Amino acid sequence: MKRQLLKGITPKGFKKRFNKDEDCYKYLSELKWADESFVCKRCGHTHYCKGHLPYARRCTRCKHDESPLAGTVFEKIKFSLLTAFQLIFDFCIIERRASTITLSSKYDIRQKTIWEFKHKVQQSIGCMNVEMLDNNVYLGKFIIEDNRKRHATNNIVVALEISGNGGVGRAYAEIIDCTSDKATKEFLERHCHPSTTIFISKEKENDILINGWSDVQFFANNEAVEMLNEHIAELKNWLCGNHRNCSHEHIQGYLNEYYFRFNLRKQKSIMFSTLVSHMANTSPKRTKSKS
């Protein structure tokens, strides 16, 4: 079975492609077992026959039936697979308007249930392979208050890729522990190619980067710095506007969400298929209820 990624899918095309649960099970099975990659989770056998459940596969040795949902982020969802696909599609295309309140009303599902699924999606995005930044990278930091804890703040570091012709490339952000001198350096190591030139401000806390990175320079291009500041302002407005009551432990999930869309902003047609494909091949994580 050849893996199929949907390209250029529109809301109308989505409804035509996914009209019932069976359509979703079929697509998920194609992604999960791409190129006939079935391996029984119980005994490791690689031969199968048709299972009892829709598009399930039954191991010919131990007779274990495995659903397309098993071992994926979709495992144990509290609504239909079609609804899950619809939520993910909304998540990819609606952006700012995809609040849990709006989606709860649209699909007649409890807001908490919607939030828990969205949190699973955010966690899944956080497990995606990082495409390392390899152009000039401008480093910025900002602080937002934690509305749930008095006098508490959240420290966020941003790395924005700016090409030689002044175009904005990809970017990443993480919530960090400001008390750790190594936090920013470790963030860059996770997201930037070792040969990348890092541009930083002349702040004391950036001293560790000067000695720990191959090519570090101070801000010089005012236009690039302005682009960085505009990027941070947009991110901050999104966090403080849409998710101003988000607790510290969940901010990274929203950063994952923001940068998944940002980094695919020129490839919006593949957002849905990219995300579903990843979720089909990612083990589920336990999520905490929103406090």
Regions found by a protein language model. Give the residues of each.
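Residue-level recognition of single "structural anchor" positions
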Residues: 1-291
